Amino acid sequence: SDMEVYQYMENVKPMPRVLIAGANSGCGKTSITCGILKALVNRELHIQSYKCGPDYIDPMLHSHITGRNCRNLDPFFSTGEDLRYLVGKDSQDVDFSVTEGVMGYYDGVGISCEKSTWTVSKETGTPTILIFNVKGMSHTMIPLIKGMVEYQDNPIAGVILNRCSKGMYQL
């Protein structure tokens, strides 16, 4: 029942976590997520990974790195309450969790934002890091990033510029 979920969640310790999202598919989410997972494991932290949506390939990579089962967070089949419960129940014996998004951050069902990675980040209150593949870009990346950050109310906390040339670091 709803009351059982709320009572359970009240007894769950807050879990440091981050969601790795992308501006689009193919921007490097999986490679960067796996790198982050490996870096955390190398620090001997106990990590719980998640994957947005019904994907099973990326979770296998996560599980191989962390040594524990990756969980799927699918907003199409789960309510916000369900998503919070799933994240909360795995928080008791881990130091940190990393969630990998699916598609573009705001890409949901049909042409809406609903049931997207954005939905998962908002419903679970997970700080989000956006990945942008900026190969071949210069100043154009600035309004793209600004637009993504300002488009909806969201928990975006940072940006990673993937395939960024050394000269663009200064931007």
Stretches with model-predicted labels:
Residues 130-133, 160-162:
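Conserved beta-strand segments of the P-loop GTPase G domain that flank and frequently precede/overlap
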Residues 10-27, 31, 37-124, 132-155, ...:
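ATP-dependent carboxylate-amine ligase catalytic core
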Residues 2-12:
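Pre-Walker A adenine-sensing motif
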